[in-house]
């Protein structure tokens, strides 16, 4: 089974329908898409009706309400593990990015090419956000459920307080005896044409209070200059 798992919060929930539509329009469709939402965060807040209607129209789309003291963090993947088998594939997705039509197919090809022995970690890609701006994100990595075994023993409150979710996933993969490989990059200009969007000013996905925020901003600016001035058609990544 191929599962896409994602989360969102109140300031981005209006984007989610478009994100999921871009996922479901892929050349390879997932068997399930889980949207994990915190009961605490959304208490007293009505979800957008178009999002509710869209999820109700397809049994593969599931809103998974999550409760507990740590629901504001680490809820992109962990809440769905109890529904999966060891060899099931999990692809995580950000909630404010439009994805290429062949993204899931590309991740699966990377997984096959590496002998199904590695997680496929996203390169930091140049992607298209909803305001037409370029964003530097690390979106849609591929895992298997067994790569997260013993997560409840590892993800203590101290881990939640001191680590972000992506770093925690990587550490769990290592602890379970797996390694990761970088994914194939996609062509930013094909993505722009697919969604009829223009390249505008680059911004960083990271908040300014994140310790890596400034370097992400510099990377976004550098990549924007590289693409717009030199018309280079490949997208940027930290590793291959």
Language-model segments: residues:
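Conserved nucleotide-sugar donor-binding
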Residues: 135-154
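A conserved hydrophobic helix/loop-capping motif in glycosyltransferases and polysaccharide synthases
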Residues: 3-11, 26
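C-terminal catalytic/acceptor-binding lobe
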Residues: 1, 14-19, 152-240
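Conserved donor-nucleotide/metal-binding helix-loop-beta segment in metal-dependent transferases, i.e.
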Residues: 101-125
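Short beta-strand-to-loop acidic/aromatic patch adjacent to the donor-nucleotide binding site
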Residues: 87-98
């Amino acid at each position: 089974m191929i599962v896409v798992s994602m989360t969102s919060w109140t300031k981005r929930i209006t984007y989610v329908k478009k994100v999921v539509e871009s996922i479901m329009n892929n050349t390879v469709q997932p068997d399930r898409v889980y949207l994990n939402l915190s009961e605490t965060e959304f208490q007293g807040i009505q979800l957008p009706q178009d999002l509710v209607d869209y999820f109700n129209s397809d049994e593969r789309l599931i809103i998974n309400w999550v409760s507990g003291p740590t629901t504001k963090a680490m809820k992109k993947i962990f809440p769905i593990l109890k529904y999966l088998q060891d060899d099931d594939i999990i692809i995580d997705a950000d909630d404010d990015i439009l994805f290429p039509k062949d993204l899931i197919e590309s991740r699966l090809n990377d997984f096959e090419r590496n002998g199904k022995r590695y997680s496929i970690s996203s390169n930091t890609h140049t992607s298209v956000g909803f305001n037409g701006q370029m964003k530097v994100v690390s979106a849609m990595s591929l895992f298997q459920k067994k790569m997260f075994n013993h997560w409840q023993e590892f993800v203590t409150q101290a881990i939640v307080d001191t680590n972000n979710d992506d770093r925690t996933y990587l550490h769990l993969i290592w602890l379970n005896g797996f390694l990761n490989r970088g994914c194939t990059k996609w062509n930013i200009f094909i993505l722009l044409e697919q969604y009829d969007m223009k390249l505008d000013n680059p911004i960083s996905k990271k908040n300014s209070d994140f310790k890596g925020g400034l370097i992400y901003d510099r990377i976004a600016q550098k990549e924007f200059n590289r693409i717009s001035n030199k018309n280079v058609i490949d997208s940027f990544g930290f590793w291959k």
